[in-house]
């Protein structure tokens, strides 16, 4: 499709969901409670797991964290990548002790939607050269 700016958006441009999908993506990417840097690190981590070539093209995770809160967020993603939704109770407690409820919700929503986008890109065999 010619609708959209990126190759990913152009694939979705064939469907009526493009606008809503893109709005959700833009809203979740905006910095609200979590920094843009930690969100980008999470995106890069998930891209390696999801085998989306298009998503992986932006680079590997950097492994650089600004503060303890960001380290906890990244640690959660590492656990999530290994066990999926079976996050141990201790990890959830650590999140609750160090992040606000709003930060936890934003973190989980960002992880979930980013994971979904990248799996879609992998299923569609989207490549950076497309």
Briefly describe each language-model feature range.
Residues 1-130:
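Hydrophobic alpha-helical segments
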């Amino acid at each position: 499709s010619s609708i959209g700016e990126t190759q990913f958006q152009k694939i979705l441009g064939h469907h009526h969901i493009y606008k809503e999908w893109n709005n959700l993506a833009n809203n979740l990417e905006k910095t609200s409670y979590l920094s843009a840097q930690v969100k980008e690190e999470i995106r890069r981590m998930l891209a390696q797991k999801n085998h989306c070539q298009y998503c992986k093209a932006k680079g590997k995770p950097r492994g650089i964290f600004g503060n303890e809160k960001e380290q906890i967020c990244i640690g959660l993603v590492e656990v999530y990548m290994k066990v999926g939704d079976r996050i141990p109770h201790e990890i959830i407690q650590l999140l609750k002790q160090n992040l606000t409820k709003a930060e936890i919700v934003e973190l989980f929503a960002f992880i979930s939607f980013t994971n979904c986008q990248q799996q879609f890109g992998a299923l569609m065999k989207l490549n950076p050269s497309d």
